């Protein structure tokens, strides 16, 4: 099973991806769960992650870099793990590119999707979109990057992008709302409830 977490900065993706990974490890064993992230996930991608999140480059160049990193990530880590029957959990994936580069920076959405289709990027089985108020999210964000220097309007566009993705991809995407008013355990419980509905036979919390 391939599961991804999406949302604006400060929405709690990293925390929830770690909690879910630990849950699956308790069920299936430490070696049967892969927790990864984007940008990153491979030696190649991790080497340029810092520059990509700090340096200002053209949106199309940025898209091409993200896509090449994602292709490498899929080929070297995600697909081999899935073929071995492992559960893969990823902090950000294709939907972040659609939201940030597409809705936020104005790159044509069809170009993003066509490019990913060309290199045969696999879509996740389940995606959790953690929806949070923009200003609350930015105040909670721990990892500072170039995007946080953008205007509030930029982040509103990204949030809207994630919301529209969830509507268009409703079979795959699950939106967790009210993040700012819930503690991590409450959000985690809602995520586990969704997992149970998607995959029967999981042991109770």
Curated annotation (Swiss-Prot):
ATP binds at residues 7-14. SUPFAM superfamilies: P-loop containing nucleoside triphosphate hydrolases. It catalyses: dTMP + ATP = dTDP + ADP. One of its GO terms (cellular component) is cytosol. It holds the Pfam family Thymidylate_kin. Its EC number is 2.7.4.9. Keywords: ATP-binding, Kinase, Nucleotide biosynthesis, Nucleotide-binding, Transferase. GO terms for biological process: dTDP biosynthetic process; dTTP biosynthetic process; dUDP biosynthetic process. InterPro entries: P-loop_NTPase (IPR027417), Thymidylate_kin-like_dom (IPR039430), Thymidylate_kin_CS (IPR018095), Thymidylate_kinase (IPR018094). One of its GO terms (molecular function) is dTMP kinase activity. Belongs to the thymidylate kinase family. Phosphorylation of dTMP to form dTDP in both de novo and salvage pathways of dTTP synthesis. This is Thymidylate kinase.
């Amino acid at each position: 099973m391939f599961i991804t977490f999406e949302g604006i900065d400060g929405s709690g993706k990293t925390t929830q991806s770690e909690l879910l990974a630990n849950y699956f490890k308790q069920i299936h064993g430490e070696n049967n769960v892969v927790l990864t992230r984007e940008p990153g996930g491979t030696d190649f991608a991790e080497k340029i992650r810092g520059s990509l999140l700090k340096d200002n480059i053209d949106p199309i160049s940025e898209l091409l870099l993200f896509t090449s990193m994602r292709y490498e990530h899929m080929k070297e880590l995600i697909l081999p793990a899935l073929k071995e029957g492992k559960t893969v959990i990823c902090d950000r994936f294709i939907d972040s590119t659609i939201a940030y580069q597409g809705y936020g920076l104005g790159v044509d959405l069809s170009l993003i999707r066509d490019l990913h289709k060309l290199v045969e990027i696999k879509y996740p089985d389940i995606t959790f979109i953690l929806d949070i108020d923009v200003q609350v999210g930015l105040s909670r964000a721990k990892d500072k990057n170039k995007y946080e220097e953008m205007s509030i309007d930029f982040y509103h566009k990204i949030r809207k992008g994630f919301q529209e993705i969830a509507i268009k991809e409703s079979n795959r995407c699950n939106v967790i709302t009210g993040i700012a008013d819930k503690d991590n355990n409450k959000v985690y419980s809602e995520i586990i409830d969704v997992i149970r509905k998607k995959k029967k036979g999981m042991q109770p919390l």
